[in-house]
Protein backbone atom coordinates (compact mmCIF):
# COMPACT_ATOMS: atom_id res chain seq x y z
CA UNK A 1 0.00 0.00 0.00
CA UNK A 2 1.41 3.36 -0.98
CA UNK A 3 -0.04 6.85 -1.22
CA UNK A 4 0.45 10.28 -2.73
CA UNK A 5 -0.93 13.71 -1.93
CA UNK A 6 -0.81 16.13 -4.84
CA UNK A 7 -2.50 19.40 -5.61
CA UNK A 8 -4.90 18.00 -8.18
CA UNK A 9 -4.52 14.24 -8.05
CA UNK A 10 -2.76 11.52 -10.00
CA UNK A 11 -3.52 10.72 -13.65
CA UNK A 12 -4.33 7.12 -12.72
CA UNK A 13 -7.36 8.09 -10.62
CA UNK A 14 -8.68 10.81 -12.89
CA UNK A 15 -6.95 12.65 -15.72
CA UNK A 16 -7.78 16.35 -15.78
CA UNK A 17 -6.23 19.61 -17.00
CA UNK A 18 -4.69 20.46 -13.60
CA UNK A 19 -2.84 17.24 -12.70
CA UNK A 20 0.65 18.66 -13.20
CA UNK A 21 0.00 22.02 -11.56
CA UNK A 22 1.75 22.80 -8.26
CA UNK A 23 -0.36 23.80 -5.26
CA UNK A 24 -0.03 25.07 -1.73
CA UNK A 25 -2.43 25.40 1.19
CA UNK A 26 -3.75 28.81 0.13
CA UNK A 27 -4.48 27.58 -3.40
CA UNK A 28 -6.43 24.57 -2.11
CA UNK A 29 -8.42 26.79 0.27
CA UNK A 30 -9.23 29.21 -2.54
CA UNK A 31 -10.16 26.73 -5.27
CA UNK A 32 -12.06 24.40 -2.94
CA UNK A 33 -14.48 27.19 -1.99
CA UNK A 34 -13.39 27.44 1.63
CA UNK A 35 -12.30 31.07 1.32
CA UNK A 36 -15.57 32.03 -0.36
CA UNK A 37 -17.49 30.65 2.62
CA UNK A 38 -15.22 32.31 5.18
CA UNK A 39 -14.83 35.97 6.12
CA UNK A 40 -17.27 38.74 5.39
CA UNK A 41 -19.35 39.07 2.23
CA UNK A 42 -17.32 39.43 -0.98
CA UNK A 43 -14.04 39.26 0.96
CA UNK A 44 -12.63 35.69 0.70
CA UNK A 45 -10.61 34.87 3.81
CA UNK A 46 -7.95 32.23 4.43
CA UNK A 47 -8.04 30.08 7.55
CA UNK A 48 -5.14 30.61 9.94
CA UNK A 49 -4.09 26.94 10.18
CA UNK A 50 -3.00 25.32 6.91
CA UNK A 51 -6.16 23.30 6.43
CA UNK A 52 -5.49 23.00 2.70
CA UNK A 53 -2.53 20.82 3.74
CA UNK A 54 -3.89 19.27 6.94
CA UNK A 55 -7.26 18.03 5.66
CA UNK A 56 -5.77 16.12 2.70
CA UNK A 57 -3.26 14.55 5.11
CA UNK A 58 -6.00 13.34 7.44
CA UNK A 59 -8.05 11.96 4.54
CA UNK A 60 -4.97 10.23 3.15
CA UNK A 61 -4.30 8.59 6.52
CA UNK A 62 -7.84 7.18 6.57
CA UNK A 63 -7.42 6.01 2.99
CA UNK A 64 -4.20 4.17 3.81
CA UNK A 65 -5.84 2.49 6.82
CA UNK A 66 -8.79 1.38 4.67
CA UNK A 67 -6.41 0.06 2.00
CA UNK A 68 -4.39 -1.85 4.60
CA UNK A 69 -7.55 -3.51 5.91
CA UNK A 70 -8.48 -4.52 2.37
CA UNK A 71 -4.97 -5.83 1.76
CA UNK A 72 -5.24 -8.00 4.88
CA UNK A 73 -8.47 -9.50 3.53
CA UNK A 74 -7.45 -9.96 -0.12
CA UNK A 75 -3.66 -10.05 -0.17
CA UNK A 76 -3.69 -7.30 -2.81
CA UNK A 77 -1.93 -3.97 -2.45
CA UNK A 78 -3.39 -0.58 -3.37
CA UNK A 79 -2.46 2.89 -4.53
CA UNK A 80 -4.11 5.66 -2.48
CA UNK A 81 -4.40 9.05 -4.19
CA UNK A 82 -5.57 12.25 -2.47
CA UNK A 83 -5.91 15.57 -4.25
CA UNK A 84 -5.72 18.72 -2.10
CA UNK A 85 -8.44 20.23 -4.31
CA UNK A 86 -10.70 17.16 -3.92
CA UNK A 87 -10.15 17.12 -0.16
CA UNK A 88 -11.25 20.74 0.24
CA UNK A 89 -14.34 20.12 -1.90
CA UNK A 90 -15.30 17.26 0.43
CA UNK A 91 -14.44 19.36 3.49
CA UNK A 92 -16.73 22.18 2.30
CA UNK A 93 -19.54 19.82 1.29
CA UNK A 94 -22.34 22.09 2.49
CA UNK A 95 -21.77 24.52 -0.36
CA UNK A 96 -22.05 21.66 -2.88
CA UNK A 97 -25.45 20.37 -1.80
CA UNK A 98 -26.88 23.83 -1.12
CA UNK A 99 -26.07 24.94 -4.66
CA UNK A 100 -27.71 21.81 -6.05
CA UNK A 101 -30.82 22.03 -3.84
CA UNK A 102 -31.48 25.79 -3.64
CA UNK A 103 -28.86 27.38 -5.97
CA UNK A 104 -27.26 29.16 -3.01
CA UNK A 105 -23.84 30.69 -3.73
CA UNK A 106 -21.76 31.35 -0.61
CA UNK A 107 -20.46 34.91 -0.36
CA UNK A 108 -18.81 34.88 3.03
CA UNK A 109 -20.65 33.76 6.13
CA UNK A 110 -18.46 35.72 8.53
CA UNK A 111 -18.86 34.30 12.02
CA UNK A 112 -22.53 33.42 11.51
CA UNK A 113 -24.25 30.27 10.27
CA UNK A 114 -26.71 30.46 7.35
CA UNK A 115 -29.06 27.84 8.81
CA UNK A 116 -28.85 28.30 12.60
CA UNK A 117 -29.29 31.34 14.84
CA UNK A 118 -27.79 32.25 17.24
CA UNK A 119 -24.56 30.62 16.14
CA UNK A 120 -21.74 33.17 16.29
CA UNK A 121 -19.30 35.04 18.50
CA UNK A 122 -20.35 37.98 20.64
CA UNK A 123 -18.47 40.80 22.32
CA UNK A 124 -17.58 40.16 25.97
CA UNK A 125 -16.14 42.65 28.45
CA UNK A 126 -12.64 41.30 27.78
CA UNK A 127 -12.81 39.75 24.32
CA UNK A 128 -15.19 37.54 22.37
CA UNK A 129 -17.42 34.63 23.31
CA UNK A 130 -18.96 31.92 21.10
CA UNK A 131 -22.57 30.82 21.53
CA UNK A 132 -24.43 28.26 19.43
CA UNK A 133 -28.08 27.30 19.88
CA UNK A 134 -28.91 24.57 17.38
CA UNK A 135 -31.87 23.37 19.46
CA UNK A 136 -34.88 25.39 20.58
CA UNK A 137 -34.32 24.18 24.15
CA UNK A 138 -30.86 25.75 24.06
CA UNK A 139 -32.28 29.09 22.95
CA UNK A 140 -34.83 28.93 25.75
CA UNK A 141 -32.04 28.18 28.24
CA UNK A 142 -30.03 31.14 26.94
CA UNK A 143 -32.78 33.73 27.28
CA UNK A 144 -33.59 32.42 30.76
CA UNK A 145 -29.96 32.83 31.84
CA UNK A 146 -29.93 36.32 30.31
CA UNK A 147 -33.02 37.18 32.37
CA UNK A 148 -35.13 37.76 29.26
CA UNK A 149 -37.95 35.23 29.66
CA UNK A 150 -40.33 37.67 27.99
CA UNK A 151 -38.61 36.95 24.65
CA UNK A 152 -40.04 33.43 24.71
CA UNK A 153 -43.24 34.66 23.06
CA UNK A 154 -41.65 37.33 20.85
CA UNK A 155 -42.62 36.51 17.24
CA UNK A 156 -39.24 37.77 16.04
CA UNK A 157 -37.41 35.14 18.10
CA UNK A 158 -39.74 32.20 18.79
CA UNK A 159 -38.28 29.91 16.10
CA UNK A 160 -34.97 29.36 14.37
CA UNK A 161 -36.39 30.63 11.07
CA UNK A 162 -37.64 33.78 12.79
CA UNK A 163 -34.25 34.38 14.37
CA UNK A 164 -32.49 33.99 11.02
CA UNK A 165 -34.80 36.62 9.53
CA UNK A 166 -34.13 38.93 12.48
CA UNK A 167 -30.43 38.13 12.86
CA UNK A 168 -29.37 41.70 13.63
CA UNK A 169 -31.91 42.00 16.44
CA UNK A 170 -30.72 38.67 17.87
CA UNK A 171 -27.11 39.84 17.78
CA UNK A 172 -27.98 43.16 19.43
CA UNK A 173 -29.99 41.42 22.16
CA UNK A 174 -27.27 38.92 23.01
CA UNK A 175 -24.42 41.43 22.78
CA UNK A 176 -26.13 43.85 25.17
CA UNK A 177 -25.88 41.06 27.76
CA UNK A 178 -22.52 39.43 26.92
CA UNK A 179 -20.58 42.70 26.88
CA UNK A 180 -21.45 43.21 30.56
CA UNK A 181 -19.54 40.04 31.53
CA UNK A 182 -16.01 38.72 31.17
CA UNK A 183 -15.35 35.52 29.27
CA UNK A 184 -14.81 33.67 32.56
CA UNK A 185 -18.11 34.96 33.93
CA UNK A 186 -19.92 33.89 30.77
CA UNK A 187 -18.41 30.42 31.03
CA UNK A 188 -19.65 30.12 34.61
CA UNK A 189 -23.15 31.27 33.69
CA UNK A 190 -23.56 29.18 30.53
CA UNK A 191 -21.44 26.11 31.33
CA UNK A 192 -23.30 22.84 30.73
CA UNK A 193 -26.51 24.61 29.76
CA UNK A 194 -25.79 26.30 26.42
CA UNK A 195 -23.07 25.26 23.94
CA UNK A 196 -20.58 28.08 24.32
CA UNK A 197 -16.97 28.99 25.00
CA UNK A 198 -14.44 31.81 24.87
CA UNK A 199 -12.57 32.81 21.71
CA UNK A 200 -9.14 31.79 22.99
CA UNK A 201 -5.74 32.97 21.90
CA UNK A 202 -2.70 30.78 22.51
CA UNK A 203 -2.02 32.35 25.93
CA UNK A 204 -5.54 31.39 27.00
CA UNK A 205 -4.99 27.87 25.69
CA UNK A 206 -1.80 27.47 27.73
CA UNK A 207 -3.73 28.43 30.88
CA UNK A 208 -6.67 26.07 30.28
CA UNK A 209 -6.70 23.38 33.00
CA UNK A 210 -8.93 21.12 30.90
CA UNK A 211 -6.26 20.82 28.21
CA UNK A 212 -3.66 19.95 30.84
CA UNK A 213 -5.86 17.11 32.10
CA UNK A 214 -6.34 15.96 28.50
CA UNK A 215 -2.55 16.00 27.96
CA UNK A 216 -2.89 18.26 24.94
CA UNK A 217 0.16 20.40 25.75
CA UNK A 218 3.04 17.95 25.79
CA UNK A 219 6.72 18.50 26.56
CA UNK A 220 9.39 17.16 24.22
CA UNK A 221 13.17 17.50 24.23
CA UNK A 222 14.35 19.48 21.21
CA UNK A 223 18.08 19.14 20.46
CA UNK A 224 19.84 22.38 21.30
CA UNK A 225 16.70 23.99 22.73
CA UNK A 226 15.72 21.81 25.69
CA UNK A 227 12.11 21.12 26.69
CA UNK A 228 9.44 22.74 24.51
CA UNK A 229 5.68 22.29 24.35
CA UNK A 230 3.81 21.05 21.32
CA UNK A 231 0.19 20.06 20.67
CA UNK A 232 -0.62 16.59 22.00
CA UNK A 233 -2.44 13.67 20.40
CA UNK A 234 -6.21 14.35 20.06
CA UNK A 235 -7.10 10.67 19.50
CA UNK A 236 -7.23 9.04 22.91
CA UNK A 237 -7.07 5.28 23.52
CA UNK A 238 -8.22 3.94 26.88
CA UNK A 239 -6.02 0.84 26.89
CA UNK A 240 -3.06 2.22 24.95
CA UNK A 241 -2.80 5.97 25.50
CA UNK A 242 -0.52 7.65 23.00
CA UNK A 243 1.80 10.60 23.28
CA UNK A 244 4.37 12.51 21.28
CA UNK A 245 7.67 10.83 22.15
CA UNK A 246 10.11 13.03 20.26
CA UNK A 247 10.32 15.87 17.74
CA UNK A 248 10.48 15.18 14.02
CA UNK A 249 13.95 14.28 12.73
CA UNK A 250 16.19 17.09 11.55
CA UNK A 251 17.14 17.31 7.88
CA UNK A 252 19.48 14.44 7.00
CA UNK A 253 19.06 12.66 10.32
CA UNK A 254 18.37 9.27 8.69
CA UNK A 255 20.53 9.69 5.58
CA UNK A 256 23.27 7.32 6.75
CA UNK A 257 20.76 4.67 7.82
CA UNK A 258 18.91 4.83 4.50
CA UNK A 259 22.07 4.75 2.39
CA UNK A 260 23.35 1.71 4.29
CA UNK A 261 20.14 -0.10 3.35
CA UNK A 262 21.29 0.29 -0.26
CA UNK A 263 24.75 -1.02 0.53
CA UNK A 264 26.44 2.37 0.65
CA UNK A 265 28.69 2.53 3.70
CA UNK A 266 31.52 4.60 5.11
CA UNK A 267 29.76 7.84 4.22
CA UNK A 268 31.32 11.06 5.33
CA UNK A 269 29.34 13.15 7.79
CA UNK A 270 28.68 15.74 5.10
Name the predicted role of every residue range:
Residues 55-62, 136-140, 168, 184, ...:
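A structural signal for well-ordered alpha-helical segments within the folded catalytic domains
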Residues 1-129, 133-134, 141:
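Active-site-adjacent "lid/gating" segments in soluble enzymes
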Residues 51, 129, 174-176, 243-246:
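Active-site rim elements
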Residues 191-242:
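A glycine-rich dinucleotide-binding beta-alpha-beta segment and adjacent secondary-structure elements
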Residues 221-269:
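Flexible, small-/acidic-enriched active-site or ligand-binding loops
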Residues 153-165, 200-209, 267-270:
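Short linear loop/turn motifs
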Residues 117-196:
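Aromatic-enriched alpha-helical interface/lid elements that frame and gate functional surfaces
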Amino acid sequence: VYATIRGYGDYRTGKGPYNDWPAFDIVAQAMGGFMAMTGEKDSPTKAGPGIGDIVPGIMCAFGVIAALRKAEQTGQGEFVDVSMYDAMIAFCERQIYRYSFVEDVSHGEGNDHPLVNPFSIYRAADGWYAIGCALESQWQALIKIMGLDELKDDNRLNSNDARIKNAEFVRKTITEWTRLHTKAQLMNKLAGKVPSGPANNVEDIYKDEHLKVRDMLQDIDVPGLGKKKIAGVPVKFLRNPGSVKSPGPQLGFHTKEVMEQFGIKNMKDD
